[in-house]
Design a protein with these regions (language model features):
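A broad, low-specificity signal for short, low-complexity segments enriched in glycine/proline
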Residues: 12-14, 53-58
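Generic hydrophobic/packing signal
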Residues: 39-40, 141
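Short alpha-helical segments that sit at the start of domains
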Residues: 1-16
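Non-catalytic recognition/regulatory regions in large multidomain proteins
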Residues: 3-5, 20-27, 32, 51, ...
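Alpha-helix boundary/N-cap detector
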Residues: 31-35, 39
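A short, conserved structural fragment
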Residues: 41, 45-55
């Protein structure tokens, strides 16, 4: 389901915890604060999420609980602008920032996240499978020079307990897919999915 930034701030305010990992939500007022709050509440009532100013509907409980699970998760992955919280029940909460400060929030089985990635990045379905894996040390400066003209790069950050544990980038060059581990400064050619 899609929500405005103000609606996400509302859900954040009624769930446990303060911050939504990786997503800087703010209540940005264009008019008076009271008018914006009223507009936000009316929008949630129109979507069937709120029954009144103080009561969630059954349909409203689902996104509120999804955001709460996202906030409680200890394991997060950020792939470009895709924010993923891995849950213990082989599920994931995915929050996708859209245009105009809107967000789409999905609760999916983890395997569906792979399908979503293949749908968003069809280039993952192409490429060659190398017979030998060759690891190559490459300093960050030469890597940045190499990747500056590459398009459709995928940046991945893996987080545990809100701390970055691993960071790497997939990029395409000369019809080949490469992975660069930013922590270890190692480049390798990878095969297609």
């Amino acid at each position: 389901m899609k929500f405005t930034e103000h609606e996400m701030v509302f859900f954040n305010s009624i769930t446990k915890g303060n911050d939504v990992f990786g997503i800087p939500l703010k209540f940005r007022t264009q008019k008076s604060h009271e008018e914006e709050v009223k507009k936000t509440i009316n929008g949630l009532i129109e979507k069937g999420v709120l029954a009144s100013e103080t009561e969630l509907t059954k349909m409203g409980f689902l996104p509120a609980r999804a955001l709460e699970c996202y906030k409680e998760s200890r394991n997060h992955i950020i792939i470009n602008y895709l924010h993923i919280a891995l849950l213990e029940q082989r599920e994931a909460i995915v929050i996708i920032p859209l245009k105009n400060r809107e967000y789409e929030m999905l609760r999916l089985p983890r395997v569906a996240v792979l399908y979503l990635l293949l749908k968003i990045y069809p280039v993952l379905q192409t490429g060659t499978v190398s017979e030998k894996e060759l690891l190559q040390l490459q300093d960050i400066d030469s890597f940045l020079r190499e990747v500056k003209d590459c398009k459709e790069n995928i940046m991945i950050g893996e987080f545990q307990d809100n701390a970055l544990t691993k960071e790497w980038l997939y990029y395409w060059k000369n019809n080949q897919i490469f992975e660069y581990d930013l922590n270890r400064q190692i480049k390798r050619e990878v095969g297609a999915v």
